[in-house]
């Protein structure tokens, strides 16, 4: 940690977004003594986790004039991280066994996550800092290191304000990334990105190709298989010869290597040589980072899903500490990442912790990029740090002077990932890490975060 010699100061900070990252960041900023205004374009907290049956007017979300929907949640979604690890460290995501309106499962549905987020906002009185139905349309640096934030409310009124700092928490699951497929422009079938997928009904009796086989791809392919004639998964992570029948009750799901080409007769050719005639393609191919409101005078750019340059995925050196990002990395312990990153941002803004010089931060960034290159890791995976998530979070925690990440959190998430890969149909309901669950609830008890004996959760959780 780099403790500052300067006097502790309170800053006027704008936070963009009232999803989990924005809510947690706002709490930490206020705890550090800053005054905070949160801008949220929707009517409620929750961000991504606010489910809506609506979707973008363009199913591929390529048309810049399309009507947009922020959420990418599908109706059947359940978490892919266990609730013990998912919650904020001083506000655990506890099951409500006595409330039938809540989902008490270890891997709950999206409505339970939204309820937890709403509970968090109420508990810490975050909503009093939020301007709902207010969209940020422009953020730009001005004199003296300050920032101009232009916002537009539901009535269309534009307002310009000056802030000492801006923390961007707008999420990165809204702007779809579409994989390039040879011949796709002349292929006649339907195409949709998972951002716009909600329920399987539109695919009834169809032959469907799902591109991508990680969390959303595994979920959506099996969801569609309930109603489709056939579902074929195309995965670039598989060997070119891959062709496997996947066991599902409907007996209609296959795994392939990636697509080689498509044709105007409706055929799709996989690199394993198999040919099918499909009705629809669903792209489960991830998302792009997107900050359409942000003007940085060329100091920050996005290149192949790399937001650069960013010191430790948070601070752009030339603009720090007045501009910061919370929540960019892809990892399993997401809410805890929001918490630890925002503690660091809050401490730096108050002057309690100092950053290295601009040159030192750039040296660190370039060393990180060089290490990725040496390992052959593509630029698009710059912010994919799941394998080193505990190491990264503990480094940030030490910088901000807060508690390190509990051992059991990383172990739960890593074990869950292995189960997801090996048993995507059952990993949420069958597990073999009860000792980690016990360790988690004993930890909550020691910290006086639960008022009943840990055995209550252990016995009812099964």
Curated annotation (Swiss-Prot):
Residue numbers binding NADP(+): 212-217
Q: Which GO terms describe its biological process?
A: glucosinolate biosynthetic process
Effect of inactivating the gene? Increased accumulation of methylthiopropyl glucosinolates in leaves and seeds.
Which terms in the GO cellular component ontology are assigned?
membrane
What chemistry does it catalyse, as a reaction equation?
a (Z)-omega-(methylsulfanyl)-N-sulfo-alkylhydroximate S-glucoside + NADPH + O2 + H(+) = a (Z)-omega-(methylsulfinyl)-alkyl-glucosinolate + NADP(+) + H2O
Origin: domain of life: Eukaryota
- What topology in the membrane does the UniProt record assign? Single-pass membrane protein
State what induces this protein: Down-regulated at late stage by auxin.
The entry assigns this protein to a family as follows: Belongs to the FMO family.
Add the further remark from the entry. In contrast to cv. Columbia, cv. Landsberg erecta has predominantly propyl C3 instead of butyl C4 Met-derived glucosinolates.
| Name under which the protein is recorded | Flavin-containing monooxygenase FMO GS-OX3
- What organism does the record attribute this protein to? Arabidopsis thaliana
**Which lineage is the organism of this entry classified under, starting from the top rank?**
Eukaryota, Viridiplantae, Streptophyta, Embryophyta, Tracheophyta
